[in-house]
Amino acid sequence: MKMNLVGYEENQEAIARAVAGIEAGDFGCALIKNNVIIHEGRGKGVSPLLELAGTEEGLKKLEGALVVDRIIGKAAAMIIVLGKATHAYGLTMSKSGEEYLQAFGVETKNNRCVDAISDRTGRGICPMERSVMEMDNPAKGVEKLQETLAHLRSKSS
């Protein structure tokens, strides 16, 4: 019978590898199942998680996974909840992200908890965070995040 390793303790080796990879800049987030990294998300911000949420295959990977991410705010938290991940480990996590995850039964851990996730200039709130600040429904939140990302990308091109 195959063991199902789901907690932080049972997955600590894979978590250590994921944290090292994120800190080295090799990837931005990782999904872990049974102490194995099953997915490394490349890209900035929430885009790697958002890409996963956009496909059936990606949602299957998220389901029951332990998500390790550089930054987990409410935006990432909504994707994690929609994908039915069971655990979220943020190198940095916002209070609103942590509260949202816990409200949906996702176990959380972080190296640092902050009041808010800043934008890339460090002078304001992240636009992805701002777009879902007042939302609670994960499916509607992820839809809003996809719209916001498309809008931000169209402005920068």
Task: Locate predicted features.
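Conserved mixed alpha/beta catalytic, RNA-binding, or beta-rich assembly cores of soluble enzyme
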Residues: 3-91, 111-131
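C-terminal binding/interaction regions
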Residues: 5, 83-86, 96-157
